[in-house]
């Protein structure tokens, strides 16, 4: 266990909610980067920022083709970093994609991407986690409400809320095919969940959130206070969101699949220590221990 | 089995798609009723008509209170017309609500409601089915794609597509809480589904569509051709839709429950005969045999 003060206790006997102890924006107004001052303010307030077109159509085609190549590569399929859906035997996610694929590594180093992360986190950044997600339609389940930070803190040992994620759409997100939902402003409250972390929890939690799931009462309070925003947008659009946003997604009964690349940047001044509420670290391809700044 | 010509074969060995053999609008331009000519045309084209406010806030309060009274009445709970969700033991639907509750009976007789049905179907109408639906949040599942007519024809013996449904919202339908989705224009093609009707299929099909479910291939073709429209709207809004619209709903992971009253009007010139593709009739509270015109 970590001896640093645990600002965000979780996975204890009872659910407990505490105000955020960290800023949302760690940079200063003159921290360089592509995000406008107005957008920074709305990110600070809501906890997210929707970018209608982060990458162009030709780049979407490039990354989508690379995604298809990876998920059809037997070597990638055999790699423990690939998450295969039992029934269909189809790949749902490939982790550490920035290490497996040079094309996705370039995307991580792209100033439109890493530049925004540095600007928000006010420092150099490294990749805490990256993955490509391939979510089919025809009833594929969504992902229930959770805060990523609650898991990254409890199971990966990230001390502070100085982490930001970006989900870049490689297919269109309609209002019908189970897109990302966020409760705007929920990032300003930390919800410590009840229930100890089971051993090897990560194996299950990649398919379905269980440990670290808010109670119905908490969800009702959050939703009544904050409402819920659904993110739609064309392929190439992106959603930046603070590590402590309460988010989830519904199932997708449409025939329209959803693919995206998901990158988590963490400040080099917030590197992972030992898990705050879990018996063991998660594997490095899920919670990085390589803190090399993105260059 | 019925000896009338079966215009819409289904539940055979293979899935088969045939063009609609019936008009969508059975009235003539001078058939009286509240729907404008332009709205009638859009209903003919899309197969549905969204009415932003069919009933007022005070009426919503009245009907919502009546819904709450019914689902908390032990006698209603014990009635076979109530569908109780096994795990939570909560009532999900109450059928034949227009017979159980005089308040809902008045709604059925309301000219804003039955007047629209007569106008669309070009004749007197009776209630083929009515129910109140109470769909909680927190992950309650939706209802997969299906055409109601496919079931009403196969299992209730409705000969022709001369039936219209209205879903009147008693709570707000957001873009996040698993609202009704329809493929606009899908009503102009009948999709006969593969697979015989199991005995007592209705007991299962009230919770989850199984017999009468389109294949992935068919859904992909329909969705590519027609797209998918999600219906949102405040409490008091309503969606009228043709009996052969391909429709479904996703799950609801939000805390916001969805309640509605669902009424199916059938033309008195299209009364039920014997099922076209099922061994036995469904119970009368699901597929009426009382053809008394609504007055």
UniProtKB/Swiss-Prot annotation, chains A, B:
Its EC number is 1.14.11.55. Binds 1 Fe(2+) ion. The keyword Oxidoreductase applies. InterPro entries: EctD, Phytyl_CoA_dOase-like. 2-oxoglutarate binds at residue 135. Its cofactor is Fe(2+). It comes from Streptomyces avermitilis (strain ATCC 31267 / DSM 46492 / JCM 5070 / NBRC 14893 / NCIMB 12804 / NRRL 8165 / MA-4680). GO terms for biological process: ectoine catabolic process. Belongs to the PhyH family. EctD subfamily. GO terms for molecular function: 2-oxoglutarate-dependent dioxygenase activity; iron ion binding. L-ectoine binds at residue 129. Involved in the biosynthesis of 5-hydroxyectoine, called compatible solute, which helps organisms to survive extreme osmotic stress by acting as a highly soluble organic osmolyte. Catalyzes the 2-oxoglutarate-dependent selective hydroxylation of L-ectoine to yield (4S,5S)-5-hydroxyectoine. This is Ectoine dioxygenase.
């Amino acid at each position: 266990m970590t001896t640093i003060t645990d600002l965000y206790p979780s996975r204890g006997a009872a659910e407990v909610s505490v105000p955020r102890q960290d800023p949302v924006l760690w940079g200063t107004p003159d921290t360089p980067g592509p995000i406008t001052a107005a957008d920074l303010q709305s990110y600070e307030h809501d906890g997210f920022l929707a970018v209608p077109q982060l990458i162009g159509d030709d780049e979407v085609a490039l990354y989508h083709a690379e995604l298809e190549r990876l998920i059809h590569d037997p070597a990638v399929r055999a790699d423990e970093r690939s998450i295969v859906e039992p029934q269909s035997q189809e790949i749902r996610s490939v982790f550490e994609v920035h290490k497996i694929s040079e094309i996705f590594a370039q995307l991580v180093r792209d100033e439109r991407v890493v530049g925004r992360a540095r600007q928000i986190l006010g420092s150099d950044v490294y990749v805490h986690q990256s993955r490509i997600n391939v979510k089919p339609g025809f009833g594929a389940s969504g992902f229930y409400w959770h805060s990523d930070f609650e898991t990254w803190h409890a199971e990966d040992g990230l001390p502070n809320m100085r982490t930001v994620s970006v989900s870049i759409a490689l297919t269109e997100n309609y209002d019908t095919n189970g897109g990302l939902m966020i409760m705007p402003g929920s990032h300003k409250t930390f919800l410590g969940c009840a229930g100890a972390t089971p051993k090897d929890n990560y194996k299950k939690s990649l398919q379905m959130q269980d440990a670290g799931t808010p109670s119905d009462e908490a969800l009702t309070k959050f939703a009544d206070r904050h409402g819920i925003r659904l993110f739609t947008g064309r392929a190439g659009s992106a959603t930046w969101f603070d590590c402590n946003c309460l988010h989830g997604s519904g199932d997708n009964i449409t025939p329209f699949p959803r693919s995206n690349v998901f990158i988590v940047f963490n400040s080099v001044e917030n590197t992972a220590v030992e898990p705050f509420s879990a018996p063991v670290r998660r594997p490095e391809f899920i919670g990085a221990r390589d803190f090399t700044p993105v260059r």
